């Protein structure tokens, strides 16, 4: 669908692409991946070990998509893309290579108590079959509670990129009505911030979709970076949050997803939550 869209036809892109491509294996290509439990590494399926090549594969995957998103966005239009913190740099490089200007990085902070996913060395020491029990206890005491380097996750990164403007901020707005923010939009009653605190939604409500985002957060972003009546695009629609939020914000929207089940969920949500 992206290939068929007109140049300079979209005002805003808000999207949450899949992070763990090789963890989704061939099922992702068939449109059946993504409904698995989460493991110790946020955003990646259980049993999948993160390695540096993961980011390179994500960047390779996003490069042609970002090229199309750059093409279809109006000059001055923004692209807001969610990412796992350890992958956001690859996502950013891909957007920059496509021609975008990187404006900022935001944090979606969630207050719900997340699982502390660090592993204690005690367990691994106890599994050492060639060690005497006394030696194990001595080593456990020596390690003094050391764990693997995973802190309790409390945020997701949001990359903010912008297609270069035509002329000045004012001239670009007068021609395309893009490139500026509506600073009246606020989550807290204060000026909009780079840290946005919104509670996580219930995954079970959306057929167990792993990375569903809060409608309130997406609606805030849409209102901040676009105007009523404009077109918002999400090329990784998932359970439909972007389209629901866009309709609530009185914007038009285009949602794309390879998973037919999620398309049906999105259609139902749009009908149930916006009428």
Residues covered by each model-derived region:
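Core catalytic lobe of class I
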Residues: 1-275
């Amino acid at each position: 669908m992206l290939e068929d869209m007109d140049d300079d036809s979209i005002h805003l892109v808000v999207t949450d692409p899949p992070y763990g491509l090789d963890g989704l294996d061939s099922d992702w290509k068939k449109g059946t991946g993504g409904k698995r439990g989460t493991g110790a590494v946020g955003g990646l399926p259980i049993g999948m070990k993160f390695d540096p090549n993961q980011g390179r594969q994500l960047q390779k995957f996003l490069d042609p998509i970002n090229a199309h998103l750059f093409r279809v966005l109006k000059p001055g239009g923004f692209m807001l893309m969610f990412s796992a913190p350890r992958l956001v740099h690859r996502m950013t490089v891909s957007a920059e290579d496509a021609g975008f200007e990187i404006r900022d990085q935001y944090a979606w902070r969630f207050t719900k108590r997340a699982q502390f996913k660090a592993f204690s060395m005690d367990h691994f020491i106890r599994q050492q079959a060639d060690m005497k029990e006394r030696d194990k206890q001595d080593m456990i005491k020596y390690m003094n509670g050391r764990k693997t380097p995973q802190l309790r996750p409390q945020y997701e990164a949001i990359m903010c990129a912008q297609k270069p403007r035509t002329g000045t901020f004012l001239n670009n707005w007068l021609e395309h009505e893009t490139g500026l923010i509506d600073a009246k939009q606020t989550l807290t009653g204060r000026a909009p911030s780079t840290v946005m605190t919104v509670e996580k939604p219930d995954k079970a409500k959306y057929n167990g979709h792993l990375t569903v985002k809060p409608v309130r957060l997406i609606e805030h972003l849409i209102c901040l970076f676009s105007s009523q009546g404009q077109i918002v695009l999400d090329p990784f629609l998932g359970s439909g949050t972007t389209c629901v939020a866009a309709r609530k914000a009185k914007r038009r929207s285009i949602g794309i997803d390879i998973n037919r089940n999620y398309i049906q969920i999105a259609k139902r949500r749009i009908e149930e939550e916006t009428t």
